Amino acid sequence: MWSSEVTNMIITGIWETLYMTLVSTLVGYVIGLPMGIILTVSDKDGIKPNAVLYKILDVIANIVRGVPFIILLVLLIPFTRLVVGKSYGSTATIVPLVIAAAPYIARMVESSLKEVDAGVIEAARSMGASNFTIITKVMLVEARTSLLVGATITLGTILGYSAMSGAVGGGGLGAIAIRYGYTRWQTDIMIVTVILLIILFQIFQTVGMKLADKFDHRK
């Protein structure tokens, strides 16, 4: 039977994992949602094409997404230390998680918004709707189911990234799995942390998909 110290450590690891995942996803959407909207609007088939702006954001998104997350973690250590004063722990890990999440979210949002029927957008435009109204009242509303599915996928991805951050000083269940499973060869603790990560992932997926189904305008 494990000691109370190990049990408390795992409980703390769960909360740290939730903290990193949820905060990173929330802040990532603060950046990624507007970025995705701008990518959609400024594309050649968007409601306000702007080739230069689209290309700049497109390149930024591709560069960040093209760097493996474990390398991005190491690459951003100086920047993370500058922002939060240290490069280790759950709070510090949020910095690279947000930077990794934002362009990923932007692409998810762009993909969702481009699924909106062009006829619906044209109908709104013919009735005199402004671009802002088309974005907020038509595109985002029509794409809400796809956006919720994207958010669900994003949560799962960020959860995996948060676990990966344990390899370079991040907190949470990932750090416990690596410290005890890889370094100390305590397989039982590693297996429990992996199971807990799977459970968290399943909870995110189940809740997210139920919400997406609830707000599906086609039903």
Segments from the language model and where they lie:
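Glycine-rich helix-loop "coupling/hinge" segments at transmembrane-helix boundaries
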Residues: 161-191, 195-196, 216
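Helix-capping/transition residues at the boundaries of transmembrane alpha-helices
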Residues: 64, 81, 124-126, 156, ...
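C-terminal transmembrane helix and the adjacent membrane-cytosol boundary/short C-terminal tail
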Residues: 38-44, 126, 190-219
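Short helix-to-coil transition segments within interhelical loops
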Residues: 113-143, 183
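Hydrophobic alpha-helical elements at and bordering transmembrane segments
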Residues: 10, 14, 18, 56, ...
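Membrane-water interface segments at the C-terminal ends of transmembrane alpha-helices
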Residues: 9-114, 149-156, 196-204
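Transmembrane alpha-helices
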Residues: 131-161
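Short membrane-interfacial helix/loop motifs at transmembrane-helix boundaries
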Residues: 1-8, 168
